[in-house]
Amino acid sequence: MLGKVNGVQIECLESMVINSREIYGKFMIEPLSYGQAITVGNALRRVLLSDVPGVTIVSVRIAGINHEFSTVKGVKEDVLEILLNLKNIVLKGNVLKNQIGRLKVQGPAIVTSGQIEFPLDITVVDPCQYIATISGNDYLEMELKVEKSSGYKLVETFSKKSPLDFLPIDSIFMPVKKVNYYVEEILDSKVAYEKLILELWTNGSLSPQQSINYASDNLVKLFNPLRVLDFSKESSSVYEQNSLIKQKLIEELCLSVRAYNCLKRVQVDSIGDLLEYSIGDLLEIKNFGQKSVEEVSKALYKKFGVKLKH
C-alpha cells in the first residue's frame, strides 16, 4: 500500500522494469463513490501524458555541418538519421536551466549515448542507445543543448531561439509513454463503491510512482485556488457598477434629436429608465422606428457595455 487518506487508499499491484527504457506500474485506488473513479482516472491520465516534465535534447551543433540535409565525412548515417537517433535518447536529471552536452569520438567506432559528456545533474538512462557509426579515422564532434519541459515541441518552436549553427530537433518531453485505466465495482458493499485500476508505462527516466505523485500534486495545485475565491466581493462590485450606470442620464448617449425626443416624451430620463424597455417596447413608442432602436442599442453598448432586453 502506498498510502491512505480520508478512507481512500492507493496500492501498487505490480511494478516491473521491462528494460532500461520502459518501466511498468499498476495501481489500485479505492473505495471511490459511484462515478468518481472515471473522473479521477480521466484527470490523472491527461496530466500524466501531457504535464509530467522530462529532459531531452532540443538542438545539436555538428562540427562542419550547417544544415540537416548534409552528410558527415566518414559517418555511415546522414545528418537526418543522426538527429532522429538523438531525439530518441532518454535523459533524466534536475535541470533548472538549459545545459550543454559534448561528444567527440574518433573512428572507426560505434557511437552511443553513453559517450556523451553531460553536466553532473544529467544522466543517460540507456548508455547503449545508438547514435552513429564512424567507418574511417574521422571524428564525429557535437554539442547538444538540453532542456526540461513538458509535452511535445516541434522544430518550429526552437528554430527562432536557437543559434544558426544549432540544428533543432522535434522534442518529446513526456516521460510517461502510455496510460490505461478501468473501473471495477466493489461488490461486497451495501453502498455503491468503485475501484480505479491505473496502468502506466514510463521511459525509464521516472518511475510510475514518481509520475503519479507529480500528476496528483499538479491537480491539487490546479484546484486549490478555487477553494479561496471570494465571489461575494466580485458580485458586490458588479452590483455597484450596474447601479451607477442606471443613474446616468440618457444625454450621455449622445443620441439623435429624433430618438432623444421620443424617449423624453415617454419620461425616459436615465439609463435605468431605458433598460426597463425591451426592443419590442421601444418599437411601440410613437415615431421610434428600427433605426432609432439600432442607434440606442449601439450607443448603450459602446458607452456602458450593456444591451437592451429582447
Swiss-Prot record:
| Example of a GO MF term | DNA-directed RNA polymerase activity
Question: What are the EC numbers?
Answer: 2.7.7.6
Q: Where in the cell is it found?
A: Plastid, Chloroplast
* SUPFAM superfamilies to which the protein is assigned, alphabetical: C-terminal domain of RNA polymerase alpha subunit (SSF47789), Insert subdomain of RNA polymerase alpha subunit (SSF56553), RBP11-like subunits of RNA polymerase (SSF55257)
| Pfam families reported for this sequence | RNA_pol_A_bac, RNA_pol_A_CTD, RNA_pol_L
Note the SS bond partners: none
**SMART domains to which the protein is assigned, alphabetical:** RPOLD
Q: Which reaction does it catalyse?
A: RNA(n) + a ribonucleoside 5'-triphosphate = RNA(n+1) + diphosphate
First-level EC class: transferase
Q: Which InterPro entries match?
A: DNA-dir_RNA_pol_insert, DNA-dir_RNA_pol_RpoA/D/Rpb3, DNA-dir_RpoA, RBP11-like, RNAP_asu_C, RNApol_insert_sf
Q: What biological processes does GO assign it?
A: DNA-templated transcription
GO cellular component term, pick one? DNA-directed RNA polymerase complex
Which stretches of sequence are listed as region Alpha N-terminal domain (alpha-NTD)? 1-230
Question: What segment(s) does the record annotate as region Alpha C-terminal domain (alpha-CTD)?
Answer: 242-310
Q: Which UniProt keywords apply?
A: Chloroplast, DNA-directed RNA polymerase, Nucleotidyltransferase, Plastid, Transcription, Transferase
The record's note on its domains? The N-terminal domain is essential for RNAP assembly and basal transcription, whereas the C-terminal domain is involved in interaction with transcriptional regulators and with upstream promoter elements.
Q: How does it assemble?
A: In plastids the minimal PEP RNA polymerase catalytic core is composed of four subunits: alpha, beta, beta', and beta''. When a (nuclear-encoded) sigma factor is associated with the core the holoenzyme is formed, which can initiate transcription.
Known function? DNA-dependent RNA polymerase catalyzes the transcription of DNA into RNA using the four ribonucleoside triphosphates as substrates.
- Family listed: Belongs to the RNA polymerase alpha chain family.
* Protein name as it appears in the record: DNA-directed RNA polymerase subunit alpha
Species of origin reads Cyanidium caldarium (Red alga)
